[in-house]
Curated annotation (Swiss-Prot):
It is a multi-pass membrane protein. One of its GO terms (cellular component) is plasma membrane. It is found in: Cell membrane. The chain crosses the membrane at residues 5-25, 42-62, 69-89, 99-119, 129-149, 157-177, 201-221, 239-259, 269-289, 293-313, 331-351, 355-375. GO terms for molecular function: xenobiotic transmembrane transporter activity. This is Quinolone resistance protein NorA. Belongs to the major facilitator superfamily. TCR/Tet family. It comes from the Bacteria. The gene is norA. Involved in quinolone resistance. May constitute a membrane-associated active efflux pump of hydrophilic quinolones. Keywords: Cell membrane, Membrane, Transmembrane, Transmembrane helix, Transport. Its main location: membrane.
Protein backbone atom coordinates (compact mmCIF):
# COMPACT_ATOMS: atom_id res chain seq x y z
CA UNK A 1 0.00 0.00 0.00
CA UNK A 2 1.17 3.55 -0.81
CA UNK A 3 2.81 5.05 2.32
CA UNK A 4 0.85 8.30 2.06
CA UNK A 5 -2.47 6.49 1.69
CA UNK A 6 -1.63 4.41 4.77
CA UNK A 7 -0.99 7.60 6.78
CA UNK A 8 -4.22 9.16 5.49
CA UNK A 9 -6.16 6.05 6.47
CA UNK A 10 -4.48 6.08 9.88
CA UNK A 11 -5.41 9.76 10.35
CA UNK A 12 -9.06 9.10 9.49
CA UNK A 13 -9.12 6.07 11.77
CA UNK A 14 -7.66 8.07 14.69
CA UNK A 15 -10.12 10.93 14.18
CA UNK A 16 -13.21 8.72 14.14
CA UNK A 17 -11.83 6.53 16.92
CA UNK A 18 -11.44 9.74 18.93
CA UNK A 19 -15.00 10.81 18.14
CA UNK A 20 -16.33 7.39 19.15
CA UNK A 21 -14.26 7.23 22.35
CA UNK A 22 -16.30 9.92 24.07
CA UNK A 23 -19.81 8.59 23.36
CA UNK A 24 -20.18 6.18 26.33
CA UNK A 25 -18.92 8.69 28.90
CA UNK A 26 -21.22 11.59 27.97
CA UNK A 27 -24.01 10.63 30.45
CA UNK A 28 -21.56 10.55 33.38
CA UNK A 29 -19.95 13.75 32.15
CA UNK A 30 -23.28 15.57 31.87
CA UNK A 31 -24.44 14.39 35.29
CA UNK A 32 -21.11 15.51 36.77
CA UNK A 33 -21.67 19.03 35.41
CA UNK A 34 -25.43 19.10 36.07
CA UNK A 35 -26.33 19.37 32.38
CA UNK A 36 -29.55 18.18 30.70
CA UNK A 37 -30.67 16.32 27.58
CA UNK A 38 -31.22 19.66 25.87
CA UNK A 39 -27.60 20.56 26.57
CA UNK A 40 -26.44 17.29 24.99
CA UNK A 41 -28.60 17.99 21.94
CA UNK A 42 -27.05 21.44 21.60
CA UNK A 43 -23.51 20.04 21.86
CA UNK A 44 -24.13 17.45 19.14
CA UNK A 45 -25.97 19.95 16.92
CA UNK A 46 -23.16 22.52 17.31
CA UNK A 47 -20.64 19.98 16.01
CA UNK A 48 -22.87 19.07 13.04
CA UNK A 49 -23.61 22.70 12.13
CA UNK A 50 -19.96 23.74 12.39
CA UNK A 51 -18.87 20.86 10.17
CA UNK A 52 -21.64 21.59 7.65
CA UNK A 53 -20.60 25.26 7.36
CA UNK A 54 -16.83 24.71 7.25
CA UNK A 55 -16.68 21.68 4.90
CA UNK A 56 -17.05 23.55 1.57
CA UNK A 57 -14.54 26.20 2.65
CA UNK A 58 -12.19 23.46 3.87
CA UNK A 59 -12.29 21.90 0.41
CA UNK A 60 -11.58 25.21 -1.30
CA UNK A 61 -8.72 26.09 1.06
CA UNK A 62 -7.24 22.62 0.54
CA UNK A 63 -7.11 23.32 -3.21
CA UNK A 64 -5.56 26.77 -2.77
CA UNK A 65 -3.17 26.26 0.17
CA UNK A 66 -2.42 22.55 -0.12
CA UNK A 67 -4.24 19.57 1.31
CA UNK A 68 -1.42 18.65 3.72
CA UNK A 69 -1.59 22.06 5.41
CA UNK A 70 -5.38 21.91 5.82
CA UNK A 71 -5.22 18.35 7.18
CA UNK A 72 -2.57 19.37 9.72
CA UNK A 73 -4.55 22.44 10.83
CA UNK A 74 -7.64 20.25 11.19
CA UNK A 75 -5.77 17.71 13.33
CA UNK A 76 -4.48 20.44 15.65
CA UNK A 77 -8.02 21.80 16.01
CA UNK A 78 -9.24 18.28 16.79
CA UNK A 79 -6.71 17.92 19.62
CA UNK A 80 -7.55 21.38 20.98
CA UNK A 81 -11.25 20.46 20.93
CA UNK A 82 -10.73 17.19 22.83
CA UNK A 83 -8.42 18.73 25.45
CA UNK A 84 -10.90 21.60 25.99
CA UNK A 85 -13.69 19.08 26.58
CA UNK A 86 -11.45 17.16 28.99
CA UNK A 87 -10.77 20.20 31.19
CA UNK A 88 -14.11 21.97 30.67
CA UNK A 89 -16.22 22.59 33.76
CA UNK A 90 -18.98 24.74 32.28
CA UNK A 91 -21.32 24.54 29.31
CA UNK A 92 -19.81 27.44 27.34
CA UNK A 93 -16.37 25.76 27.24
CA UNK A 94 -17.93 22.47 26.12
CA UNK A 95 -19.92 24.25 23.41
CA UNK A 96 -16.81 26.03 22.10
CA UNK A 97 -15.02 22.67 22.13
CA UNK A 98 -17.73 21.08 19.94
CA UNK A 99 -17.70 24.02 17.49
CA UNK A 100 -13.92 23.68 17.11
CA UNK A 101 -14.37 19.91 16.74
CA UNK A 102 -16.83 20.43 13.90
CA UNK A 103 -14.40 22.83 12.22
CA UNK A 104 -11.66 20.20 12.46
CA UNK A 105 -13.86 17.57 10.80
CA UNK A 106 -14.79 20.09 8.11
CA UNK A 107 -11.10 20.54 7.29
CA UNK A 108 -9.69 17.03 7.71
CA UNK A 109 -12.34 15.18 5.67
CA UNK A 110 -12.13 17.28 2.44
CA UNK A 111 -8.33 17.34 2.70
CA UNK A 112 -7.99 13.59 3.16
CA UNK A 113 -10.59 12.81 0.48
CA UNK A 114 -8.87 15.10 -2.02
CA UNK A 115 -5.39 13.77 -1.23
CA UNK A 116 -6.51 10.15 -1.60
CA UNK A 117 -7.87 11.11 -5.03
CA UNK A 118 -4.54 12.78 -5.87
CA UNK A 119 -2.26 9.89 -4.94
CA UNK A 120 -4.50 7.01 -6.10
CA UNK A 121 -4.10 5.55 -9.61
CA UNK A 122 -7.37 5.96 -11.51
CA UNK A 123 -8.07 2.21 -11.46
CA UNK A 124 -7.71 2.10 -7.64
CA UNK A 125 -9.69 5.19 -6.61
CA UNK A 126 -12.99 3.39 -6.05
CA UNK A 127 -11.27 0.67 -4.00
CA UNK A 128 -9.34 3.21 -1.92
CA UNK A 129 -12.47 5.23 -1.15
CA UNK A 130 -14.21 1.99 -0.21
CA UNK A 131 -11.40 1.26 2.24
CA UNK A 132 -11.78 4.78 3.65
CA UNK A 133 -15.48 4.17 4.35
CA UNK A 134 -14.67 0.86 6.06
CA UNK A 135 -11.98 2.53 8.19
CA UNK A 136 -14.38 5.28 9.27
CA UNK A 137 -16.89 2.64 10.36
CA UNK A 138 -14.13 0.73 12.19
CA UNK A 139 -13.23 3.86 14.15
CA UNK A 140 -16.85 4.41 15.12
CA UNK A 141 -17.22 0.76 16.18
CA UNK A 142 -13.98 0.45 18.19
CA UNK A 143 -14.08 3.96 19.69
CA UNK A 144 -17.03 3.48 22.06
CA UNK A 145 -15.66 0.11 23.16
CA UNK A 146 -12.28 1.54 24.12
CA UNK A 147 -13.82 4.69 25.62
CA UNK A 148 -16.16 2.71 27.87
CA UNK A 149 -13.30 0.77 29.43
CA UNK A 150 -11.15 3.90 29.79
CA UNK A 151 -14.01 5.52 31.70
CA UNK A 152 -13.52 2.87 34.41
CA UNK A 153 -10.36 4.83 35.28
CA UNK A 154 -11.80 8.34 34.76
CA UNK A 155 -14.67 9.74 32.69
CA UNK A 156 -12.31 12.47 31.44
CA UNK A 157 -9.58 10.06 30.31
CA UNK A 158 -11.11 9.27 26.86
CA UNK A 159 -10.98 12.97 25.95
CA UNK A 160 -7.30 13.25 26.89
CA UNK A 161 -6.57 10.07 24.93
CA UNK A 162 -8.47 11.36 21.87
CA UNK A 163 -6.49 14.62 22.02
CA UNK A 164 -3.23 12.65 22.18
CA UNK A 165 -4.31 10.63 19.13
CA UNK A 166 -4.82 13.90 17.26
CA UNK A 167 -1.28 15.02 18.08
CA UNK A 168 0.10 11.65 16.93
CA UNK A 169 -1.81 11.94 13.65
CA UNK A 170 -0.50 15.53 13.22
CA UNK A 171 3.14 14.43 13.67
CA UNK A 172 2.72 11.56 11.21
CA UNK A 173 1.12 13.91 8.69
CA UNK A 174 3.91 16.49 8.94
CA UNK A 175 6.61 13.85 8.48
CA UNK A 176 5.07 11.44 5.98
CA UNK A 177 2.51 13.32 3.86
CA UNK A 178 3.54 15.35 0.79
CA UNK A 179 1.31 17.34 -1.54
CA UNK A 180 1.61 15.94 -5.09
CA UNK A 181 2.84 18.20 -7.89
CA UNK A 182 -0.39 17.62 -9.78
CA UNK A 183 -3.57 17.58 -7.78
CA UNK A 184 -7.30 17.41 -8.26
CA UNK A 185 -9.58 20.29 -7.36
CA UNK A 186 -12.51 19.51 -5.12
CA UNK A 187 -13.55 22.99 -4.04
CA UNK A 188 -16.24 25.29 -5.41
CA UNK A 189 -16.81 25.27 -9.11
CA UNK A 190 -18.34 28.09 -11.07
CA UNK A 191 -22.10 27.84 -10.86
CA UNK A 192 -23.72 27.87 -14.26
CA UNK A 193 -27.48 28.61 -14.07
CA UNK A 194 -28.19 26.74 -17.30
CA UNK A 195 -27.00 23.52 -15.64
CA UNK A 196 -29.56 23.92 -12.86
CA UNK A 197 -32.38 24.38 -15.36
CA UNK A 198 -31.50 21.05 -16.97
CA UNK A 199 -31.98 19.16 -13.70
CA UNK A 200 -35.35 17.46 -13.22
CA UNK A 201 -35.92 18.67 -9.67
CA UNK A 202 -39.18 16.71 -9.26
CA UNK A 203 -37.20 13.46 -9.40
CA UNK A 204 -35.24 14.43 -6.28
CA UNK A 205 -37.89 16.13 -4.10
CA UNK A 206 -39.36 13.06 -2.40
CA UNK A 207 -36.00 11.26 -1.93
CA UNK A 208 -34.55 14.45 -0.41
CA UNK A 209 -37.47 14.73 2.03
CA UNK A 210 -37.10 11.04 2.90
CA UNK A 211 -33.37 11.55 3.53
CA UNK A 212 -34.07 14.52 5.81
CA UNK A 213 -36.77 12.66 7.76
CA UNK A 214 -34.67 9.54 8.27
CA UNK A 215 -31.48 11.44 9.20
CA UNK A 216 -33.60 13.43 11.68
CA UNK A 217 -34.99 10.29 13.32
CA UNK A 218 -31.77 8.27 13.33
CA UNK A 219 -29.60 11.07 14.71
CA UNK A 220 -32.21 11.87 17.37
CA UNK A 221 -32.15 8.30 18.66
CA UNK A 222 -28.39 7.82 18.42
CA UNK A 223 -27.63 11.11 20.18
CA UNK A 224 -29.77 10.30 23.21
CA UNK A 225 -29.17 6.53 23.35
CA UNK A 226 -26.33 6.69 25.89
CA UNK A 227 -28.23 9.12 28.13
CA UNK A 228 -31.46 7.10 27.73
CA UNK A 229 -29.95 3.77 28.80
CA UNK A 230 -28.02 5.46 31.60
CA UNK A 231 -31.24 6.83 33.11
CA UNK A 232 -33.51 3.86 32.33
CA UNK A 233 -31.41 0.88 33.46
CA UNK A 234 -28.40 2.63 34.99
CA UNK A 235 -26.00 1.58 32.23
CA UNK A 236 -22.38 2.43 33.02
CA UNK A 237 -20.02 3.76 30.33
CA UNK A 238 -18.73 0.17 29.91
CA UNK A 239 -22.29 -1.13 29.36
CA UNK A 240 -23.00 1.60 26.81
CA UNK A 241 -19.75 0.83 25.00
CA UNK A 242 -20.67 -2.88 24.77
CA UNK A 243 -24.12 -2.05 23.36
CA UNK A 244 -22.87 0.45 20.76
CA UNK A 245 -19.80 -1.56 19.74
CA UNK A 246 -21.75 -4.82 19.58
CA UNK A 247 -24.53 -3.20 17.56
CA UNK A 248 -21.96 -1.62 15.24
CA UNK A 249 -20.21 -4.95 14.64
CA UNK A 250 -23.48 -6.76 13.90
CA UNK A 251 -24.60 -3.88 11.66
CA UNK A 252 -21.33 -3.97 9.72
CA UNK A 253 -21.60 -7.75 9.26
CA UNK A 254 -25.15 -7.41 7.96
CA UNK A 255 -24.00 -4.68 5.53
CA UNK A 256 -21.13 -6.82 4.25
CA UNK A 257 -22.85 -10.20 3.96
CA UNK A 258 -26.57 -9.52 3.51
CA UNK A 259 -27.16 -6.07 1.97
CA UNK A 260 -26.21 -7.10 -1.59
CA UNK A 261 -28.32 -10.24 -1.28
CA UNK A 262 -31.37 -8.23 -0.16
CA UNK A 263 -30.90 -5.85 -3.09
CA UNK A 264 -31.24 -8.79 -5.50
CA UNK A 265 -34.74 -9.56 -4.21
CA UNK A 266 -36.08 -6.11 -3.22
CA UNK A 267 -36.02 -2.66 -4.74
CA UNK A 268 -34.36 0.02 -2.59
CA UNK A 269 -37.72 1.58 -1.68
CA UNK A 270 -39.27 -1.74 -0.67
CA UNK A 271 -36.20 -2.59 1.39
CA UNK A 272 -36.22 0.83 3.10
CA UNK A 273 -39.93 0.44 3.95
CA UNK A 274 -39.42 -3.01 5.51
CA UNK A 275 -36.31 -1.81 7.37
CA UNK A 276 -38.31 1.08 8.82
CA UNK A 277 -41.13 -1.24 9.89
CA UNK A 278 -38.53 -3.51 11.50
CA UNK A 279 -37.01 -0.48 13.30
CA UNK A 280 -40.43 0.62 14.59
CA UNK A 281 -41.07 -2.85 16.06
CA UNK A 282 -37.65 -2.95 17.72
CA UNK A 283 -38.02 0.60 19.12
CA UNK A 284 -41.41 -0.33 20.61
CA UNK A 285 -39.74 -3.33 22.26
CA UNK A 286 -37.04 -0.99 23.61
CA UNK A 287 -39.70 1.17 25.28
CA UNK A 288 -41.37 -1.89 26.84
CA UNK A 289 -38.14 -3.58 27.98
CA UNK A 290 -36.69 -2.80 31.40
CA UNK A 291 -34.02 -5.45 32.03
CA UNK A 292 -30.26 -5.14 31.50
CA UNK A 293 -29.84 -8.00 29.01
CA UNK A 294 -33.17 -7.40 27.31
CA UNK A 295 -32.20 -3.83 26.46
CA UNK A 296 -28.69 -4.96 25.46
CA UNK A 297 -30.04 -7.48 22.92
CA UNK A 298 -32.66 -5.03 21.62
CA UNK A 299 -29.94 -2.38 21.23
CA UNK A 300 -27.99 -4.72 18.94
CA UNK A 301 -31.15 -5.20 16.86
CA UNK A 302 -31.85 -1.45 16.65
CA UNK A 303 -28.41 -0.60 15.27
CA UNK A 304 -28.65 -3.41 12.69
CA UNK A 305 -31.83 -1.82 11.28
CA UNK A 306 -30.30 1.65 11.13
CA UNK A 307 -27.13 0.36 9.45
CA UNK A 308 -29.19 -1.29 6.71
CA UNK A 309 -31.28 1.83 5.95
CA UNK A 310 -28.36 4.19 5.25
CA UNK A 311 -26.72 2.35 2.32
CA UNK A 312 -30.15 1.68 0.79
CA UNK A 313 -30.90 5.42 0.66
CA UNK A 314 -27.48 6.19 -0.84
CA UNK A 315 -27.99 3.43 -3.41
CA UNK A 316 -31.43 4.76 -4.33
CA UNK A 317 -30.13 8.30 -4.83
CA UNK A 318 -27.40 6.96 -7.09
CA UNK A 319 -29.84 4.91 -9.19
CA UNK A 320 -32.24 7.80 -9.86
CA UNK A 321 -29.47 10.34 -10.50
CA UNK A 322 -28.48 9.21 -13.99
CA UNK A 323 -25.63 11.47 -15.10
CA UNK A 324 -26.21 13.82 -12.12
CA UNK A 325 -24.30 11.70 -9.61
CA UNK A 326 -22.43 14.67 -8.13
CA UNK A 327 -25.61 16.69 -7.71
CA UNK A 328 -27.44 13.73 -6.13
CA UNK A 329 -24.55 13.03 -3.77
CA UNK A 330 -24.43 16.67 -2.69
CA UNK A 331 -28.19 16.76 -2.15
CA UNK A 332 -28.04 13.56 -0.11
CA UNK A 333 -25.20 14.95 2.01
CA UNK A 334 -26.93 18.32 2.53
CA UNK A 335 -30.24 16.89 3.72
CA UNK A 336 -28.46 14.31 5.89
CA UNK A 337 -26.52 17.14 7.56
CA UNK A 338 -29.73 19.10 8.12
CA UNK A 339 -31.32 16.07 9.80
CA UNK A 340 -28.21 15.49 11.90
CA UNK A 341 -28.41 19.11 13.08
CA UNK A 342 -32.15 19.36 13.80
CA UNK A 343 -32.68 15.85 15.24
CA UNK A 344 -30.44 16.15 18.34
CA UNK A 345 -31.85 19.60 19.19
CA UNK A 346 -35.45 18.38 19.35
CA UNK A 347 -34.59 15.00 20.88
CA UNK A 348 -32.61 16.65 23.67
CA UNK A 349 -35.50 18.97 24.55
CA UNK A 350 -37.96 16.05 24.50
CA UNK A 351 -35.71 13.96 26.76
CA UNK A 352 -36.01 16.62 29.46
CA UNK A 353 -39.81 16.27 29.26
CA UNK A 354 -39.77 12.44 29.44
CA UNK A 355 -36.91 10.00 28.85
CA UNK A 356 -39.04 7.88 26.46
CA UNK A 357 -40.12 10.91 24.37
CA UNK A 358 -37.17 10.77 21.90
CA UNK A 359 -37.94 7.08 21.27
CA UNK A 360 -41.58 7.91 20.55
CA UNK A 361 -40.39 10.63 18.18
CA UNK A 362 -38.08 8.17 16.39
CA UNK A 363 -41.02 5.75 16.04
CA UNK A 364 -43.23 8.50 14.61
CA UNK A 365 -40.54 9.65 12.20
CA UNK A 366 -39.95 6.06 11.02
CA UNK A 367 -43.67 5.62 10.33
CA UNK A 368 -43.66 8.92 8.43
CA UNK A 369 -40.75 7.53 6.44
CA UNK A 370 -42.84 4.48 5.47
CA UNK A 371 -45.60 6.79 4.20
CA UNK A 372 -43.09 8.83 2.17
CA UNK A 373 -41.68 5.62 0.66
CA UNK A 374 -45.17 4.50 -0.39
CA UNK A 375 -45.80 7.90 -2.01
CA UNK A 376 -42.48 7.69 -3.85
CA UNK A 377 -43.25 4.14 -5.06
CA UNK A 378 -46.58 5.31 -6.51
CA UNK A 379 -44.82 8.24 -8.19
CA UNK A 380 -42.20 5.92 -9.72
CA UNK A 381 -44.91 3.55 -10.96
CA UNK A 382 -46.71 6.43 -12.72
CA UNK A 383 -43.48 7.55 -14.38
CA UNK A 384 -42.87 4.02 -15.68
CA UNK A 385 -46.40 3.87 -17.14
CA UNK A 386 -45.86 7.21 -18.89
CA UNK A 387 -42.63 5.92 -20.43
CA UNK A 388 -44.37 2.86 -21.88
Amino acid sequence: MNKQIFVLYFNIFLIFLGIGLVIPVLPVYLKDLGLTGSDLGLLVAAFALSQMIISPFGGTLADKLGKKLIICIGLILFSVSEFMFAVGHNFSVLMLSRVIGGMSAGMVMPGVTGLIADVSPSHQKAKNFGYMSAIINSGFILGPGIGGFMAEVSHRMPFYFAGALGILAFIMSVVLIHDPKKSTTSGFQKLEPQLLTKINWKVFITPAILTLVLAFGLSAFETLYSLYTSYKVNYSPKDISIAITGGGIFGALFQIYFFDKFMKYFSELTFIAWSLIYSVIVLVLLVIADGYWTIMVISFAVFIGFDMIRPAITNYFSNIAGDRQGFAGGLNSTFTSMGNFIGPLIAGALFDVHIEAPIYMAIGVSLAGVVIVLIEKQHRAKLKQQDL
